[in-house]
Amino acid sequence: MGKPKAYYRLLLPSFLLLSACTVDISQPDSSATAVDVEAKTWAVKFQHQSSFTEQSIKEITVPDLKPGDLLFSSSLGVTSFGIRVFSTSSVSHVAIYLGENNVAEATGAGVQIVSLKKAMKHSDKLFVLRVPDLTPQQATEITAFANKIKDSGYNYRGIVEFIPFMVTRQMCSLNPFSEDFRQQCVSGLAKAQLSSVGEGDKKSWFCSEFVTDAFAKAGHPLTLAQSGWISPADLMHMRIGDVSAFKPEKQLQYVGHLKPGIYIKAGRFVGLTR
């Protein structure tokens, strides 16, 4: 009986690394009573790579949006596919809805403010997560920050450094029993592998870096981790019901899908989603 157990102990970490699967395994709440049989079971939570954490999705329209909402998207292009492969995620881009049909984002053309119509046109799939307790004043400050750095460059160096980091950080998922270990491990690798730019010296951003900085400037940080460490997938996993690599200040709320995308539509067709 000893050998099979040893094999399982070796295979489980290997499976987690190869599949880039982040897992949380935790004991039940200490407040649960001893007679509560169900509470004695261990809680196992897997990271959701899809754009939704439940089997059903909610389709929304533009009037459902609020200033400060996060717009996550992917396209059918090669670049989007590559980002999704390396980040083992269903998203490759994140932007901020400013209100009045305007969107702030950082793309290869730099930091821009574009129409929501244009942002939707360039996306195959687009869904919305909301930051809890964001005030109108903070939303206004996010818009002011976007206008201030508009036409700044794109952080190509940060993206190049991010590619090996996204691979090596998967090692931090090998211990599924400690959320603190995983977050400290990822932060340690980020410090070792990624460049650090002083706040006043920053002249360029990639998409999730811009989003993270915008909320920090508004006094409502999404996470205390450095913005240059954060990918679109990291922000997506900060939602309720998911497992995040970096600790969120507050978990994001799923609002709905503006565009389901071809994969979700195909899943509906064969009955995998609804």
Language-model features: where?
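Sec-dependent bacterial lipoprotein signal peptides
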Residues: 1-19
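Cysteine-nucleophile amide-bond enzymes
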Residues: 20-274
